[in-house]
């Protein structure tokens, strides 16, 4: 669990964020209606094949929970390195697991270890995959470098309201750490990230996968996104529950090389 204590005008405020003793699995997410079985099988195939997947969503949308669920599909023989600001991930079933955690500076302002430092170190540790708990600063540069230098199957999360917003935010974060042309940044992002999964918290407080989009390269200087799955709302039940489900749009994946090399097929897309 994580705690945060801060004082406001009325006195101290303590916020406690508790995690379940056992990680929530993809099967649980299917049962509660957060994702359909078809979409879950689709993502399972992509994780096994080594697609780089970014999970996007607002605060409290379930990004860390979903990242944990997807990590269960990583082959247990692979070497996995996780990088986090504070340890939240509950990775299970991976024997060769290295967990790196950032550290703030001491009272003298020394001995800080940043996410960027840890990502640079992770690249020297021969990982098969890297999981970054959340990208929120110029560490996005190192993450894209990892994804573009043979570390397929990497996963991360970020705060954004749509797949396009997530890519736009990544552009901004990269430019915070590198002085390069915007088109070069977009090219790096387009070649690094394969899939963006958008999560959302609906008005009935349920958490859903809203979109699964493929990053389908560049066109006229802009990154192309193609929706493979999209949540379709059909109204509300009498108790106010949002009625709808995640549906395949009929679009096919344009980038299938990783699937072919891994000998993996997807149920759709």
Question: Where on the chain are the PLM-derived regions?
Answer:
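Conserved lysine of the Walker
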Residues: 63
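Conserved P-loop NTPase nucleotide-binding/switch module
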Residues: 84, 90-98, 122-220
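NTP-binding/hydrolysis catalytic cores, primarily Walker-type P-loop NTPases
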Residues: 205-269
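P-loop NTPase switch/communication element
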Residues: 20-31, 48, 68, 72-120, ...
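Well-ordered alpha-helical segments embedded in enzymatic catalytic cores
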Residues: 38-42, 114-118, 139-142
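Walker A (P-loop) phosphate-binding loop of P-loop NTPases
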Residues: 60
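Short, small-residue-biased leader/transition segments that mark boundaries at the very start
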Residues: 1-6
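Glycine-rich adenosyl-nucleotide cofactor-binding module
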Residues: 10-56
């Amino acid at each position: 669990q994580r705690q945060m204590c801060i004082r406001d005008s009325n006195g101290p405020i303590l916020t406690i964020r508790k995690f379940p003793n056992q990680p929530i699995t993809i099967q649980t997410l299917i049962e509660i209606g957060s994702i359909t079985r078809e979409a879950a099988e689709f993502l399972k195939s992509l994780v096994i094949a080594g697609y780089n997947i970014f999970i996007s969503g607002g605060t409290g949308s379930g990004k860390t929970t979903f990242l944990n669920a997807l990590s269960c599909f990583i082959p247990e023989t692979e070497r996995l390195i996780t990088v986090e600001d504070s340890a939240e991930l509950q990775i299970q079933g991976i024997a060769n697991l290295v967990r790196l955690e950032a550290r703030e500076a001491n009272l003298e302002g020394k001995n800080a270890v940043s996410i960027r430092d840890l990502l640079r170190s992770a690249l020297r540790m021969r990982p098969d995959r890297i999981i970054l708990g959340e990208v929120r600063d110029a560490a996005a540069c190192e993450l894209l470098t990892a994804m573009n230098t043979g570390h397929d199957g990497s996963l991360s999360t970020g705060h954004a309201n749509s797949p396009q917003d997530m890519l736009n935010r990544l552009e901004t974060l990269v430019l915070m750490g590198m002085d390069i042309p915007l088109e070069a940044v977009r090219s790096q992002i387009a070649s690094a990230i394969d899939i963006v999964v958008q999560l959302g918290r609906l008005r009935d407080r349920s958490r859903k996968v809203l979109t699964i989009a493929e990053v389908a390269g560049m066109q006229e200087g802009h990154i192309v996104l193609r929706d493979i799955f999209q949540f379709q709302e059909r109204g509300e039940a009498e108790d106010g529950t949002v009625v709808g489900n995640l549906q395949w749009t009929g679009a096919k994946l344009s980038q299938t090389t990783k699937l072919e090399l891994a000998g993996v097929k997807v149920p759709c897309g």
